[in-house]
Curated annotation (Swiss-Prot):
One Gene Ontology MF term: magnesium ion binding
Binding site for GTP: 165-172, 190-194, 212-215, 282-285, 315-317
Name by which UniProt lists this protein: GTPase Obg
PROSITE patterns: G_OBG, GTP1_OBG, OBG
Originating gene: obg
Quaternary assembly: Monomer.
Function noted in UniProt: An essential GTPase which binds GTP, GDP and possibly (p)ppGpp with moderate affinity, with high nucleotide exchange rates and a fairly low GTP hydrolysis rate. Plays a role in control of the cell cycle, stress response, ribosome biogenesis and in those bacteria that undergo differentiation, in morphogenesis control.
Protein location: Cytoplasm
Length: 407
């Protein structure tokens, strides 16, 4: 199941308590204090990871507590640090304070991480309190508690382009035709129940991310239908592709449908209504005479706006206009990326090649399984291991002849 909003409480690990101990050793009178410090509690880190597409792992667990630090011990032995708790979230996750509602952090880049709660500091042992005036201190410190945070995590998909429109307008079909995404497609409204993302490869060097959200209906901004729950997924999109069906199955007017969606965007977020928009009439094979297209174009000519520069017609069934549409989208996306770079903003690119390379740890065999010369070079083996024991033909161990290093 798809989860894009969860409420979680995090608690970092408590620091370990300091130890009160005195050195007790034979022939060492008045050994003095030797209590070690407690270890620092574990912190909780959130990391944006490629391949994580939902907040489902947080849906059934509402409280995360990190490991405590170890207690200090005698002989000046410090407690061990708590093991860091690292949790992976999708790129585009916003961390919001549940009490005040302000955004604490936006994780938008692959590999970006944020320490949501820091572990408590370990307490000092009594050895720390030794002074010339107090040679045998009998005091220590308790470990400090770890930070606690109650947050809401919201997933806002990292998409360059957002597909919007009425239910059954052909959004999922278009996504499946121009990308490798395979959303559920059927001939009834509200087939799409959660957002789908697809990467559209224009050529070897150019690509963009397309987000398909459930269809919007009148009253969506007030909680009617499904689309209002997922409008946040197009908030980051710099371009909206508004799909219009020429002959809606419910017999509604395409122009009125377009106006209704625009009003819902305005009610949800005024910045979305002012976003760059490309209007596309889908299923053009159902309008062979071009009558609906002429009506739509006439409406846009009478109501000029920045968001409706022109009208395009496509057919996902016959591939009419798809190549031209993808080219136009790529041009607008590239222009926006250039504007972001000029403004000092790094565009978010989610590709497999962008993922941070994690060095592989060398696998070491336990001593009882490792060969006698497995960790040595051939040169060392030849010079220093000539005296190694060998097996005779009878299966008995025959000691080798040890070489004199001085010779």
């Amino acid at each position: 199941m798809f989860f894009d909003r969860v409420e979680i409480e995090f608690q970092a690990g408590k620091g370990g308590d300091g130890c009160m101990s005195f050195r007790k050793e034979k022939y060492v009178p008045k050994g003095g204090p030797d209590g070690g410090d407690g270890g620092r509690g574990a912190s909780i880190v959130l990391e944006a990871r490629l391949g994580v597409n939902s907040l489902a792992q947080f849906a059934t667990r509402k409280f995360f507590r990190a490991e405590k630090g170890g207690f200090g011990m005698g002989a000046l032995r410090h407690g061990r640090k708590g093991r860091e708790m690292r949790l992976f979230v999708p790129c585009g996750t916003s961390i919001i304070d549940a009490k005040d509602g302000f955004v604490i952090k936006d994780l938008t880049q692959v590999g970006e991480e944020f320490v949501i709660c820091r572990g408590g500091k370990g307490g000092h042992g009594n050895a720390r309190f030794k002074t010339p005036q107090n040679q045998a201190p009998r005091e220590r410190e308790l470990g400090q508690p770890g930070e606690t945070r109650h947050v809401i995590m919201e997933l806002k998909s990292i998409a360059d382009v957002g597909l919007i429109g009425k239910p059954n307008a052909g959004k999922s079909t278009l996504l499946s035709r121009i990308s490798s995404a395979r959303p559920e497609i059927a001939d009834y409204p509200f087939t799409t129940k959660y957002p789908n993302l697809g990467i559209v490869d224009v050529d070897i060097e150019r690509s963009f991310i397309l987000a398909d959200i459930p269809g919007l209906i009148e009253g969506a901004s007030e909680g009617i239908g499904l689309g209002h729950e997922f409008l946040r997924h197009v908030e980051r999109a710099g371009l909206l592709v508004h799909l219009i069906e020429p002959t809606p199955v419910d017999g509604s007017d395409p122009i009125q449908n377009y106006v209704a969606i625009r009003e819902e965007l305005q009610h949800y977020d005024e910045s979305l209504a002012d976003r760059d928009e490309l209007v596309v009439m889908t299923k053009c094979e159902l309008d062979p005479d071009g009558e609906v297209r002429e009506q739509l174009q006439a409406y846009f000519d009478e109501h000029p706006a920045n968001h409706a520069r022109d009208l395009r017609s496509i057919s996902a069934a016959t591939d009419v206009g798809l190549k031209e549409l993808v080219g136009e989208i790529m041009t607008r996306v590239a222009k926006r990326r250039e504007e972001m770079i000029e403004a000092g903003i790094t565009p978010t690119l989610i590709r497999q090649d962008d993922a941070p390379v994690t060095p592989k740890k060398e696998r070491r065999l336990p001593p009882h399984k490792a060969a006698a010369t497995g960790g040595l070079s051939d040169e060392v083996q030849a010079q220093d291991i000539q005296g190694a024991a060998t097996l005779s033909d009878t299966g008995k161990v025959v000691p080798g002849e040890r070489r004199d290093r001085s010779s």
